[in-house]
Regions:
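Left-handed beta-helix
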Residues: 1-120
Length: 120
């Protein structure tokens, strides 16, 4: 794994082949994942090949294989942001899902690679 000089990793598992330039807390990064400069990944799991671009925030999420999360995008949210506990849940991105720059994926959302919301 390559950990950049501005990276901040705490209480996380980082596999071989990862590149971490941002902040990773309480998370698991599978092999060949990338976390860009200024990006934050917390309480999340990134599957192999997932990319979190600069400035993006991923919280309480499961990010599938080969997903790409664009610059300054947001995926998931902490539980305390929900007014009703039933309205909160982990955000899940299926394999190959691409989230555009600045896009927001709310908590308790399940998306597939075609960006269709999957109803549980």
């Amino acid at each position: 794994a390559y950990v950049g000089p501005k990276a901040d990793i705490g209480n996380s598992a980082v596999a071989k082949g990862c590149e971490v330039l941002g902040e990773v807390k309480n998370s698991v990064l599978s092999y060949n994942t990338q976390v860009g400069e200024g990006a934050v990944v917390s309480y999340s799991v990134l599957m192999p090949g997932a990319v979190v671009e600069s400035g993006a925030v991923v919280q309480y999420a499961i990010v599938g294989e080969n997903c790409r999360i664009g610059r300054d995008a947001q995926v998931g949210a902490p539980p305390e942001t929900a007014q009703d506990p039933d309205d909160w849940g982990v955000a899940v991105l299926g394999p190959g899902t691409v989230i555009g720059d600045g896009e927001i994926v709310p908590a308790k959302t399940l998306l597939d690679r075609h960006h269709g919301e999957v109803k549980a």
